[in-house]
């Protein structure tokens, strides 16, 4: 519902593509950040099987959405979107570490969804 509200807040259909691309890319970057920051909660499972990304992979996964956001939406909107995703991801990561001892596939997917929802909330307030 938050995604639908975010898209419907964009009155010009051609403007919908830029936030859609940025939100999708940045929320996936948040997953890579969680994979790097949190240990696997279990030895088996998708979180452990995926492994831990190296620093270069993390830098690429985080830098590309930021550059894309600045290029497509401007620096102010980019900062608001990336900031919202960062806050949501960090809070989710802290909760996952406390509740589960680290990341699982579900934790990574939940982090992506929360980062995306946080950014769509920003889109609805800025447009």
What is each PLM-predicted segment?
Residues 1-127:
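Hydrophobic alpha-helical transmembrane segments
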């Amino acid at each position: 519902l938050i995604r639908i509200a975010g898209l419907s807040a964009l009155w010009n259909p051609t403007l919908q593509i830029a936030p859609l691309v940025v939100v999708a890319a940045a929320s996936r970057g948040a997953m890579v950040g969680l994979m790097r920051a949190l240990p696997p909660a279990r030895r088996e499972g998708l979180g452990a099987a995926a492994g831990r990304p190296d620093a270069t992979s993390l830098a690429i996964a985080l830098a590309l959405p930021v550059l894309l956001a600045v290029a497509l939406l401007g620096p102010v909107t980019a900062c608001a979107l990336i900031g919202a995703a960062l806050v949501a991801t960090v809070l989710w990561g802290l909760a996952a570490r406390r509740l589960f001892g680290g990341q699982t596939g579900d934790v990574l997917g939940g982090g992506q969804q929360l980062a995306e929802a946080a950014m769509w909330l920003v889109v609805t307030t800025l447009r």
